[in-house]
Amino acid sequence: MKSLYTPTDYYMIRVPLVHQDLKNENSQDIDQLLHDLCNDSLFREQILVSSRTLYETIHTFLQAPDKLKGKKKRNFQQAILKYATRRATRTTPFGLFSSVGIGSFSDKNHLSFNQHSFYKKARVDLEWLYQLIRKLENEYTDRLSFTLNSACYIKGDRAYLLYSTDGKSEEVSVRATSVFYLINELCGESAAYQDIIRCLIDNYPNTPINKINQYVADLIDKEFLISNLRPPMTVSDQFQYLIDQAESRHIPNELIQACKDIQYQIDAYNRITIGEGEHQYLNLIETMNKLIKASSPLQVDAGLADSSIQLDNETSLAISELASMFTYMASPSANTLDHLEKYHNVFLERYGYEREVPLLEMLCSSTGIGAPATYTNPANEFFEETSFGEQFSPEMKQFFMRKYFESVRKKAPIQLDDETFHRICNSEIADEEIPLSFELNFFVKLRNGRVKLYLGPNVGSTRAGKTFGRFSHMSDSISEIIKTLHNKEKELTECNTKVCELSIVPNQTRSGNVTRNVSYREKEMSLFTNSALHLNDSVKAEDILIGINKDHNFYARHKTTGEILSFESNHMFNPLLMTNAVRFLLEISRDGKRKWNDFPWFSIYSDFKYIPEIKYKEITLSCEQWLIYKNDLSMHSNASLEEIKSPFFEFHRTYELPQTFYIVNADNRLLIDIENDCTLDVFFWELKKTNHNQPLQLVAVEHDADALMDRNQNDYSGEIVVPLLRKQPEKPLYLPVLNAIEGSGSDRIKMPFEDWLFIKLYCKQTREEELIAFEIADFYNQISDQYPVRHFFMRYRDPKPHIRLRFNGKAEVLYSLFPQLLNWLKSLREKGLVSESVITQYEREIERYGGLSLMEAAEQLFCEDSKVVEMMIRMHRMKDITISKEIAGMVSVIQFLEQFELTFEEQLTFLERNSLQNEYRTEFKKDREMYIEICNSDRDWDNLKKTSDGGMLYETLKTRKMAAAHYAFLIKKAFDNKDEVYSRIGSIIHLHCNRLFGTDRELENKILTLCRHSLYAQRYQKMNGSLAWK
């Protein structure tokens, strides 16, 4: 297995502030333990920073314990015990409980650190900061400058924002009047408030000044306009940025001084040793609340200044091998069907390969195709199936099931290695499928002096540096690592692509504490705040076009510069919580890449009561796991702890649980020791809180000892986050700049009776052929004798199956035939053929068929081919020909390629590119001679014409020859590149198969593949003289 990745020299180390020896101190005497903890200055400050409510309850417990009785006492006890356990065992950064630092790879291990190097870094909470900003924007509007929010876009006669930051408004919009367009143009760059007002007065002199002021104030209040006070999310100190901007705009000095006092107190608090800052923290919060009242005005993190921790290069090599294995094991993107793959098909059905569509138009349910299935911010205005098939091959599933039963029988871990994977994984992987970078998390343990790695519960992140981003303010060394990663990212990224940082203030502003980071990327899209980059390098939501490349992957392009953009976010905020547009941009940056973190055992073993330990070589991927339900213990709602103990210990013996295990929820881990009544009590209460059909997940504690140690030889839990980068740069991807055509222009959108009349005919799929071959064909023959019109049809699902029928003629002609059309539609309904008919606008797929100048010829070919297909289906239904529909379809496809004046070799090249070359070989071999004979075009299809029905088929197909030749002449004249020519021919062939076979893409692939096999076999015979060259 080829190595695909290189770990970076440096990684993040995450260490709790308390060593393991403290976690069980006085654990059996619950009252004493509570008193010890509540009098521990370090624990008190940790709780104060994390939960002010619990901190105040500690005071109640110490000063007036009688006030805590019954349920209140029990809840307090549970909360304290859980925090006490997490502070020594959980490495995930949270307030002052766990620290972040930097470690490195070296020749040998160095696992000790200075326990006195822990430090804290407080900064203002982003929610508090934005409340202050909104207050200043409201009170000192006339002193500020404003720009248009990059989250703003115009649709129809209204301007919208992608989302709101008040956490409740589903949609924010204003009328897109001439006044708004004027402000839009003026505030593309920062404009002083007074200049905005002056411009409006000059353009609307008869409008009262108070009305102008109110209009602009409304835009500011709704956040269409954002002030210069709003700090970029990628600067190191947002509060200092605000102070500097306020000073430059002459905000009253007393307010600025209040901010400076807070900044001074924050700096002073940061210098105080952790565990000694309780009093200063309370004073600081009080000062901040005097200015702006908030539930949690301060964000505090802990750091580890000692960077001497080292892991040996052998560990680095093992991690790179694991990263490669994960990628090889992942299903090729072409073999998976998820929400994005399904969206590819929806996009192509609507727009085709040659069209680039504005992002926001595409995602709109009314003007576009809506958001992908599973997107909810906002949800589509139509129902969509969101279930997807198996993501893993049957071979992969069988392999892991076999491994499972072997492991259970032998009572041994599921052991994976390269040799076993060679049996189920393809050793070849396409370059474009290899992710550019990612991160892996490991708990670091020690066995007999050797480092042992355990994959962390949250596994890692999808881009190197994401885990570091939120902590970039903690130290220069963390910022430098991010800078190095972003520079390396630039070197490895496909040369025609620019990486753009998605910098957002989330709809729940407090979540902005997670999205604050530092970025060294070339481009930035900042939503609801200002960008740290120059205007030329800032991207707006309205700037983005979406297309699909020839590898069937989405891409984004800047509509003005033409640059290909890859969007990333240097933080760990959950994309599922983001607005649809932002989530989509992040997801398509990994479109076509292997989903390395979609592990087979997650889904294959998901409902198993017990899962053995899983290992790859010496790395533990998953410790033993169990699921326990209330029903396992016959547990009712009023069960006492004593009643539960006996059935639990029986469960414990039956399933051979260890003495210590974790209750796990995502990366939340709560240590339980069954010989410790305090933690056992916690376990029972956690189980009691679950629903009857909701299990607790239990995970065995790691076998090995904690590896990290302080100068006093105390052991600490430790976790590392290792960035990995692909070894080779991405191959260049050439995407031609397409000639954009106005999305809603009259050349694209044809309203009813504007030369076209488009009707959707909803009917059962079982009666589609009857509708096509008889009703539509007969109706057209009837009206074409009276009116100069033409028509074409195609089949579609939205998701209901229907026929899309279009008539073309002058407006007066279409109006004249409309009464007959209505009578015909009425008769179809009476016959039970059509359940619903809808007249709507016709959106021409201009790019897909070569541009505006070729569209008339393409539509003429659609009309001729529609008549051909109507005749083909009719002949089959009337049994005028005995040739099967599949064979007739093959003949039709090959004859179409001839009518496009492609040589035999060009036909074969086209089919090689548009078929599944390794599929349907058995079926072809079964009737090889028949396929070769009937699909042979030698001597003007002499073999086909020998039979009467073959002759009928030949004459039918010949009727579209002139239209096909004319279109072929035009596309060859318009495009020098054969790929472009083949693309247009492919679209015509696809639409022909759609008319003949319906929306069954699998059958279409089969027909094209059998055509390929037939021509390939003919080529062999022709080369050997068995067939005459045409």
Curated annotation (Swiss-Prot):
A GO cellular component annotation in the UniProt record: plasma membrane
Transmembrane segments: none
Record Pfam families: Lant_dehydr_C, Lant_dehydr_N
InterPro entries, per the entry: Lant_deHydtase_N, Thiopep_bacteriocin_synth_dom
Subcellular location: Cell membrane
UniProt entry keywords in alphabetical sequence: Cell membrane, Membrane, Transport
NCBIfam families reported in the protein's UniProt record: thiopep_ocin
Protein's name in the database: Subtilin biosynthesis protein SpaB
